[in-house]
């Protein structure tokens, strides 16, 4: 007898698929692809694995499902943080993903099919070339819960500039359209649907997989010039976030958000 799927929730995962020189890293979490520490760790490890694999020439970073790209930090884990050390460790997960992408010798193509919040915007910014659909609105919501986009900030600012980054940060409850994000440089292209987007992603990935790896590595190094201090900078930002997340303001704001959503 076929079992009912009512109430069934897929389990979280991070998986990597390798095919014809292209590594596709896909992550999923049933809560709108939110990012608990173990997912962040696995994404960083997967990027490193693809980087070390000589058969891989280009990487695609995507999330599962067809609605949200990434809801950012897991609120459940934020609420469970008891001290500064735990806070620093959690936020270091975002630093590790961004730094893994930054130091990866291979181009990373981002695939953003839906809304991106906080760390999801940071992850998109850490890719080298990002595709999106028209449903991929973005928001940096950190200030609304009493912290700030400290860890992802350098990656976002590098991609869209200080003015647009300031606009996103200070309007922490506002969604900005995919078209706005394209105009600011976060997204290279915005498509009507995932079918059109995936066709173009595959075309670019195949072209890059047949390009000179040495030339691509040199180009990537040039593109990321000026970020050599990010190992230290992002960990410093993680410490700052780890302190702020312990405040009563943040605890109350997260509780209020969870009750209303």
What label would you give each PLM region?
Residues 5-26, 169, 174-208, 216-228, ...:
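Amphipathic alpha-helical segments at domain termini/boundaries
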Residues 40, 75, 153, 162-166, ...:
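A general structural signal for well-ordered alpha-helical segments in protein cores
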Residues 46, 93-105:
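Catalytic-core regions built around general acid/base machinery
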């Amino acid at each position: 007898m076929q079992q009912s799927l009512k109430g069934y929730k897929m389990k979280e995962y991070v998986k990597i698929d390798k095919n014809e020189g292209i590594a596709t890293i896909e992550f999923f979490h049933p809560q709108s692809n939110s990012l608990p520490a173990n997912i962040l760790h696995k994404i960083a490890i997967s990027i490193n694995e693809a980087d070390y694999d000589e058969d891989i020439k280009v990487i695609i970073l995507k999330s599962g499902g067809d609605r949200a790209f990434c809801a950012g930090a897991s609120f459940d884990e934020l609420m469970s943080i008891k001290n500064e050390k735990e806070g620093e460790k959690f936020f270091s997960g975002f630093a590790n993903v961004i730094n893994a992408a930054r130091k990866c010798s291979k181009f990373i193509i981002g695939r953003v099919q839906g809304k991106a919040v906080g760390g999801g915007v940071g992850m998109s910014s850490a890719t080298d070339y990002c595709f999106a659909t028209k449903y991929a609105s973005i928001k940096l919501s950190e200030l609304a819960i009493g912290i700030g986009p400290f860890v992802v900030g350098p990656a976002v600012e590098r991609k869209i500039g200080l003015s647009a980054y300031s606009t996103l940060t200070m309007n922490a409850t506002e969604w900005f359209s995919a078209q706005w994000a394209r105009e600011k440089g976060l997204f290279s292209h915005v498509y009507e649907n995932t079918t059109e987007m995936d066709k173009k992603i595959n075309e670019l990935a195949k072209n890059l997989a047949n390009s000179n790896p040495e030339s691509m590595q040199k180009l990537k190094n040039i593109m990321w010039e000026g970020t050599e201090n990010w190992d230290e900078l992002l960990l410093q930002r993680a410490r700052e976030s780890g302190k702020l997340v312990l405040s009563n303001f943040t605890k109350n704001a997260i509780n209020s958000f969870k009750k209303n959503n």
